Amino acid sequence: MTPRLAATVLVVRDDPFEVLMMERNARMLFASALVFPGGTVDGADFSEHWLPLVDGASGLEQEERALRIAAARETFEEAGILLAESSAFAPDIPRSMRFIDVVRNAGVRLGLGGLHKIGHWIAPEVAARRFDTHFYVAGVSADTIPVCDGGESVALEWIAPARALELAEAGSRNIIFPTRMNLKRLAESHSVAEALEAARRPVYTVLPVIEATRDGHIVRIPAEAGYGTTCDRPHPDVTR
């Protein structure tokens, strides 16, 4: 099965350093999991009509441009935050409107240059649903107020990366393996500036492998991926 191209965004702010996470709807894939805003790339994200409406697209391949547009679109649709070229803000514009019209009506240009890739994960070949997901980090001002869409997400919260990892380890929050690994990497930073600087490192494409053992299935990733962890239990939604 060919994986679907997808983008997700680690939206971060200072004072204190936190990342925006959302709780998935209990009726959807990865039910009630704590995730970053994100989703699959649409055909409209590839449109040439975007060219006069984006900033920072010079030198980007068409697919990379579409990925960043999708990342910005999902951030707006799920959290109400528009990642514009000058600053991120929450425009009073219906989220049901086509995203390209949202940007036009807001009178801004999307800040594609403010989206920095920090991860690339492709779902295991045996996964029931496969996504080719590109992870980005984007900084916003400390007073940015996200607004839950009430559809795919039922709650939004700012949380310190290390705290999110603690909750996952304690079993009080459901956070899937790729999300935890990117939280772990983000927790190495202590400010938006540090997180953006860390995003300058080369990105390793991770293709996890699911193995059967006497104690059940495990998912493995290469040590070269640099996450400091090489195995975990796969989420049930990955294998069913």
Label the model's feature ranges.
Residues 1-240:
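N-terminal leader/linker segments that precede catalytic domains of diphosphate-processing enzymes
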